[in-house]
Regions:
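Hydrophobic core register within WD40 beta-propeller blades
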Residues: 147, 181, 402-405, 446, ...
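C-terminal motif of bacterial Sec signal peptides marking the signal peptidase cleavage site
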Residues: 14-17
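Conserved blade-ending motifs and adjacent loop-strand segments that build the rim/top face
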Residues: 387-400, 431-454, 482-501
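Sec-dependent signal peptide recognition
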Residues: 2-9
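Short glycine/acidic-enriched loop and turn motifs that connect beta-strands
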Residues: 141-145, 208-210, 254, 302, ...
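Structural hallmark of WD40 beta-propellers
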Residues: 409-412, 456-464
């Protein structure tokens, strides 16, 4: 019976295949609509520049009658589909740019009414303001913090400066001494009147934090209203992005998160618990995190590493030791003097995940003369530490202002003696004097910053220093990891500079790894 059914199915299939096709087809070449006179991209200043376009339109159909549509939509949208706003229904466009400073796509649709055929032209449009491109400097006067902006209209080297922008626009400085600057490209706010993604600069201090609309530099929230619940402690604060579009807030050793792929209004949730007993903890200001990773923290109370995966949950996740680790990730009796991220490596199939390498400098709580340099290999919620003991013979032993070169040479930079910049090769422990700031200056930070934007690319070692109530930030090129030549530029202003960050319309969380 089974064979009979198979035979009948084959016969039916053959009869169907032999059915004559009486449909009518037109095999002539399809219509082609050509549009000329539109550039491949545009960069325009909001409320100042007009987008004036007079395209040439033609068709291979001789009797074509066209109708037109100009529209624009935002590229950086999460949680909903992009919405096309109609600008005009004419062949030409003369439109005053009013959109917020961010990435947009201009759409030009030409339709032949005779045939119904349409041609679409999609063009990236970067909308900027004076505030949306340049080097931002977080600085303080010892008790209050502010922002300076060094303008870069045509290249990465600044040509102008705007001082004390935060206070001049918002009416007052931010309390406390400045900490890290960070940037969030998909932070939610209602600054435009409706809830949506807002490109946001975050200024943090040891007493407060402010989310700031890059479009206008007006503050959105400060610590008083940045949390759903009023904070019981105020500072030290810092905000940074993590994997899964999560944002993290450290405040007074506690951590809060926003899961940004879910509905939110730009406010951070409740304090993460350490365990079911709500055991007290106090997280270090140092962390390991970027948009590819979980966020990893070190509890200074218990000397224990913890993690948060993609911002989710209500409690910190514990870390397991990998066999062969030189030091446990839990209760290791250490104080962290520095910690940061060195590299992220994607494992091929069947793993299909990222693993991370970080670095830390520890000091033993029982014997403060014992210091250790640790390489930290992280895979999910497991960790292996490989230790190198430091002695007085190592310059790093007395180092300060440490920083790592994420994704590049296996080097750590640090300052010594207040005015010397040193590097340490983490592969062979070789230490090298890289630069000495002039007499009287004191180094306040060292950073490695990179950017790949066309015409604005940079790969700098940046050294901040202070003298007589003013700051200097020297920006150096590097060769094989070492400082190369004289500074490309030196930024100067009043106060003490604590951090620097480059912002442009193309910058996002993935282009900046925020760390000390």
């Amino acid at each position: 019976m089974k064979n009979l059914w198979i035979y009948m199915m084959v016969v039916v299939a053959m009869m169907t295949a032999c059915k004559k096709d009486h449909s009518n087809y037109d095999y002539k070449t399809g219509e082609k609509i050509t549009v000329k006179g539109i550039e491949s991209s545009y960069t325009l200043i909001s409320e100042l520049d007009r987008l004036t376009l007079t395209p040439e339109v033609s068709s291979t159909e001789p009797n074509a009658q066209f109708e037109y549509l100009w529209g624009i939509y935002e590229t950086n949208v999460q949680g909903s589909a992009p919405v096309l706003d109609t600008l005009a229904k004419t062949k030409d466009l003369n439109y005053l740019i009013k959109q917020a400073a961010k990435g947009w796509v201009l759409v030009y649709r030409v339709t032949n009414k005779t045939t119904g055929y349409s041609q679409y032209i999609n063009v990236p449009v970067n909308v900027v303001t004076e505030f949306t491109r340049g080097w931002y400097v977080a600085k303080d006067d010892g008790t209050q913090s502010d922002l300076d902006l060094f303008l870069t209209p045509t290249s990465i080297v600044p040509t102008g400066k705007r001082e004390n922008l935060y206070s001049s626009i918002n009416g007052s400085k931010l309390p406390g001494q400045a900490n890290l600057l960070s940037f969030l490209s998909a932070y939610k706010s209602t600054v435009t009147g409706t809830l949506g993604n807002t490109r946001t600069l975050v200024l943090s201090t040891d007493k407060d934090v402010a989310t700031v609309n890059v479009n206008t530099l007006k503050k959105i929230f400060t610590l008083d209203n940045l949390l759903f619940d009023a904070p019981t402690v105020k500072g030290p604060c810092q905000v940074f992005p993590g994997g899964g579009s999560a944002y993290y807030l450290l405040n007074g050793g506690n951590v809060h998160s926003i899961v940004n792929i879910s509905a939110n209004i730009g406010k951070f949730g409740g304090r993460f618990l350490k365990d079911a007993n709500n055991t007290p903890y106090s997280l270090s200001k140092y962390f390991i995190s970027n948009t590819l990773s979980n966020a990893y923290f070190f509890d200074e109370t218990s000397s224990t590493f913890f993690a948060i995966g993609n911002g989710y949950g209500t409690a910190l996740s514990s870390i397991s030791d990998v066999t062969g680790t030189a030091m446990s990730a839990s209760n290791n009796n250490q104080k962290v003097l520095y910690m940061g991220l060195k590299s992220a490596t994607y494992l091929p199939s069947p793993a299909l995940r990222y693993v991370f390498t970080g670095c830390a400098v520890f000091q033993d709580k029982s014997n403060s003369s014992n210091k250790t340099l640790s390489s930290i290999d992280i895979d999910g919620y497991t960790m292996k530490l490989t230790n190198t003991s430091l002695t007085n013979a190592d310059k790093l032993y007395n180092g300060a202002n440490m920083t790592l070169m994420y994704g590049q040479e296996n080097l750590m930079y640090f300052s010594m003696g207040g005015n010397q910049v040193w590097s340490r090769n983490l592969s062979n422990n070789f230490e090298k004097l890289e630069y000495t700031v002039p007499a009287g200056e004191e180094i306040t930070f060292i950073r490695h910053k990179t950017g790949a934007e066309t015409n604005y690319a940079y790969n700098y070692i940046m050294v901040g220093s202070k003298i007589n109530g003013t700051y200097k930030i020297r920006m150096f090129n590097k060769a094989s990891g070492s400082i190369s030549g004289s500074p490309v530029a030196t930024l100067e202003g009043t106060g003490t500079a604590k951090d620097i960050l480059y912002i442009s319309p193309s910058v996002s969380e993935s282009t900046n790894t925020i760390q000390w």
